[in-house]
Amino acid sequence: MKLNRIKLILEEKGISQTWLSKRLGKSYGMVNAYACNRIQPSLDILLQIAEILQVDVKDLITDKNER
């Protein structure tokens, strides 16, 4: 079960996990773990990711069609 949509949003925007890791100040391995749903980011990190990617935090956790 996918708990977040970080990887999908990155792909839709054409943004690499490496770029996000640098902007977020986290290692590539940590961002990859978030993107692959091996580790779930805290709410604070999700909010930071949403701000960096310029998306609503809801878009990182649910599909617009599911709302």
Q: Where do the protein language model's features map onto the residues?
A:
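A short, Lys/Arg-rich alpha-helix, primarily the initiator
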Residues: 1-15
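Residues within the helices of the helix-turn-helix
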Residues: 7, 18, 47
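Residue-level signal for the short linker/turn that defines the boundary of a DNA-recognition helix
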Residues: 14-15, 41-44
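Short amphipathic recognition helices of helix-turn-helix/homeodomain-type DNA-binding modules
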Residues: 60-67
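Short alpha-helical DNA-recognition segment
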Residues: 14-33
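DNA major-groove recognition helix of helix-turn-helix/homeodomain DNA-binding modules
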Residues: 44-59
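The alpha-helix within a helix-turn-helix
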Residues: 10, 21, 50
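DNA major-groove recognition helix of helix-turn-helix
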Residues: 10, 24, 35, 61
